[in-house]
Amino acid sequence: DVALIGGLNYYKAVDEGKQLLGSFDNNIWSGKVGIQFGAHTVQVGLQRNNGDDDFDYLRQSDSIYLDNSIQYSDFNSPKEKSWQVRYDLDMEPFGVPGLSFMTRYAQGWDADYSNANEVYMRRDDNGDPLTNQKRWERDIEAKYVVQTGSLKDMSFRVRQMTTRATDYESDLDEVRLIVEYPLEVL
């Protein structure tokens, strides 16, 4: 079995009201294409922030659905462009239903705060706006979803993340254990 995968996301944000923090007019888009063949899925994605400010959203809320918004990096800095490649492996065809693996790599470049609103402005030690900022992130994940019993659909993930960036950004390494248990409320 072969299936094509694709998606497109677009957001536009504008300020309203008294504009006490200055003006804000921004848009960002992302797109991905991929192919699924048997147990394997390969995807590539592109993303671009066309605005002069970070594309703002409620942090830690999963309220932004952009293809390159991944574990740590959102690749949403002013004028930033980014790409991603992702590979998923479903172990069910190999006799282990519920087990899957994922790895992805994303890279961003050209982040430029030269025209950013003062609220979003990021500067170097000399007070100059940051320009030509770059970063990358790599995620590796193993996931298991319980197949039967009272814990059916409960999932356990172990994900290792590494991100590196130019000056004034974070270089991080972390491991997360993510446990999800779906509840039906109604």
In which residue ranges do the predicted regions lie?
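Outer-membrane beta-barrel translocator domains and adjoining extracellular loop/strand segments
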Residues: 13-26, 54-60, 112-121, 167-173
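Transmembrane beta-strands of outer-membrane beta-barrel pores
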Residues: 10-16, 37-39, 46-52, 62, ...
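Outer-membrane beta-barrel "beta-signal"
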Residues: 85, 140-144, 171-186
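Long, internal scaffold/assembly segments composed of regular secondary structure
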Residues: 1-56
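Short loop/turn motifs that connect adjacent beta-strands in outer-membrane beta-barrel proteins
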Residues: 1-5, 92-99, 147-156, 168-170, ...
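Residues that define the transmembrane beta-barrel architecture of outer-membrane proteins
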Residues: 2, 25-29, 79-83, 134-138, ...
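Membrane-embedded beta-strand positions of outer-membrane beta-barrel proteins
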Residues: 6-8, 33, 42-44, 87, ...
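C-terminal structural cap/anchor segments
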Residues: 57-133, 137-147
